[in-house]
Amino acid sequence: MSYPKKVELPLTNCNQINLTKHKLLVLYEDMLLGRNFEDMCAQMYYKGKMFGFVHLYNGQEAVSTGVIKLLDSKDYVCSTYRDHVHALSKGVPSQNVMAELFGKETGCSRGRGGSMHIFSAPHNFLGGFAFIAEGIPVATGAAFQSIYRQQVLKEPGELRVTACFFGDGTTNNGQFFECLNMAVLWKLPIIFVVENNQWAIGMAHHRSSSIPEIHKKAEAFGLPGIEVDGMDVLAVRQVAEKAVERARQGQGPTLIEALTYRFRGHSLADPDELRSRQEKEAWVARDPIKKLKKHILDNQIASSDELNDIQSSVKIDLEQSVEFAMSSPEPNISELKRYLFADN
């Protein structure tokens, strides 16, 4: 049974957010890539090209794009089992992510990780993690080494920022509280991004937490806790920009609670029978991609033809990614134990 509860999203005046045409189109293209990549994953999964659990990100694109597109190449991102789109936003090539989902040697994890373990050292993408909260200590460690390099090893340059993504269900786990405490104690350059999509598999968020407003939990540890409309990429970017600047300047962590919603079931094996039709329709009406498209067209920032060209480019990219994945070799069975240890 679904327990729908109307979620009031924080209001943001997008017209007060001044971004260049180029930056806006980068955001639009990144969200389109994420959405269409996940749709292609669903097609390939049901055709038997992918195996195991596959968790899709449809509906939550504004969070990934709004945060990650503010980061530099040297910054870090740590994800969850719903990790494909985070990797794409960080710059991991779509063909290598697709090949990983196919279990091929050309995948970003050499075909050993699959859907829940996307990883790319060249892009400082620290990976997806199959169990909730696993990534938070890893992300905290990445932020700690950034401080250590600057303060102890006296390496020049700016602090590297870490963005750590996790869901609402994770915030009842011990690692969440422990790492918030450490991050504040050591003023770590980390942004904790809670993608509150209202459901932890089949558990409605408001039924699982004594304080449903996750951002309020930051107060106990002495760091800023900010709630944002996770269906609005410009609102997310505005909040994340301040968090990145704060981290980069050595002022410590920020907790961002992005109110969002997944348009598909928990995984492709989930029939999605627990959520009501009314609840899903209300959130789908807030589609972040359609919202940004309307903003661009209403303000005459770009034409429909330009946006259609972006859509076509994304479609071609994904078709090529599937062709690449299908034509790539399987891992050699003789190398089954390779990559288990650092010397490999």
Swiss-Prot record:
Q: Which InterPro entries match?
A: DH_E1, PDH_E1_Alpha_Subunit, Pyrv_DH_E1_asu_subgrp-y, THDP-binding
Entry's NCBIfam families?
PDH_E1_alph_y
Reported function? The pyruvate dehydrogenase complex catalyzes the overall conversion of pyruvate to acetyl-CoA and CO(2). It contains multiple copies of three enzymatic components: pyruvate dehydrogenase (E1), dihydrolipoamide acetyltransferase (E2) and lipoamide dehydrogenase (E3).
This chain belongs to the protein called: Pyruvate dehydrogenase E1 component subunit alpha
Grouped into one coarse class, the protein's main location is plastid
Specify which residues bind Mg(2+) according to the UniProt entry for this protein: D168, N197
Which keywords describe this protein according to UniProt?
A: Chloroplast, Magnesium, Metal-binding, Oxidoreductase, Plastid, Pyruvate, Thiamine pyrophosphate
Enzyme's top EC category = oxidoreductase
Highest taxon in the source lineage: Eukaryota
Q: What is its EC number?
A: 1.2.4.1
- List positions binding thiamine diphosphate: Y81, R82, A130, I132, D168, G169, N197, H266
- Catalysed reactions, as listed in the record: N(6)-[(R)-lipoyl]-L-lysyl-[protein] + pyruvate + H(+) = N(6)-[(R)-S(8)-acetyldihydrolipoyl]-L-lysyl-[protein] + CO2
Q: Which cofactor does it need?
A: thiamine diphosphate; Mg(2+)
Quaternary structure, from the entry: Heterodimer of an alpha and a beta chain.
Q: Which organism is it from?
A: Porphyra purpurea (Red seaweed)
What are this entry's molecular-function GO terms?
A: metal ion binding; pyruvate dehydrogenase (acetyl-transferring) activity
The answer to whether keyword Chloroplast applies is yes
> What subcellular locations does the record give?
Plastid, Chloroplast
Q: Name one GO biological process term.
A: pyruvate decarboxylation to acetyl-CoA
Which PANTHER family does the entry mention? PYRUVATE DEHYDROGENASE E1 COMPONENT SUBUNIT ALPHA (PTHR11516:SF60), PYRUVATE DEHYDROGENASE E1 COMPONENT, ALPHA SUBUNIT BACTERIAL AND ORGANELLAR (PTHR11516)
User: Cellular component terms, GO, for this chain's entry?
Assistant: chloroplast
Q: Where does pyruvate bind?
A: H55, Y81, R82, A130, I132, D168, G169, N197
